Curated annotation (Swiss-Prot):
Described function: Brain peptide responsible for activation of prothoracic glands to produce ecdysone in insects.
Organism annotation: Bombyx mori (Silk moth)
PANTHER family documented for this protein: INSULIN-LIKE GROWTH FACTOR II (PTHR46886:SF1)
SMART domains found in the cross-reference section: IlGF
Gene: BBXB4
Protein name, UniProt field: Bombyxin B-4
Residue ranges listed under propeptide: 49-67
Similarity-based family: Belongs to the insulin family.
Amino acid sequence: MMKTAVMFMLVVVINLMCSGEAQEVARTYCGRHLADTLADLCFGVEKRSGAQYAPYFWTRQYLGSRGKRGVVDECCFRPCTLDVLLSYCG
C-alpha cells in the first residue's frame, strides 16, 4: 500500500513539473547577463523600422501600460519572465 502511494505521488509531481501549465519563473537580468539573454532570445527576429509607424504612436497615451519603462526597469530592477524579454525583440 505504501509503495503504491509513493508511486502515485511521484507520478503526480513529475506530471506537474512537465506540464505546460507550470508558471514560468521570473528572474532578474542585469548588465552583461541581460544583454546576452536578449541576444540569444532575439537572434533571427526581424527588426522593425520605427519609420513604419506614424509619429502619433509615440505619444505618451499610446505607449500603453509600459509607458517609458525599458527592459532594465522591467527586468533588472524587478524580476521578469522570458515572455517579457521576448516582447523587446523585433
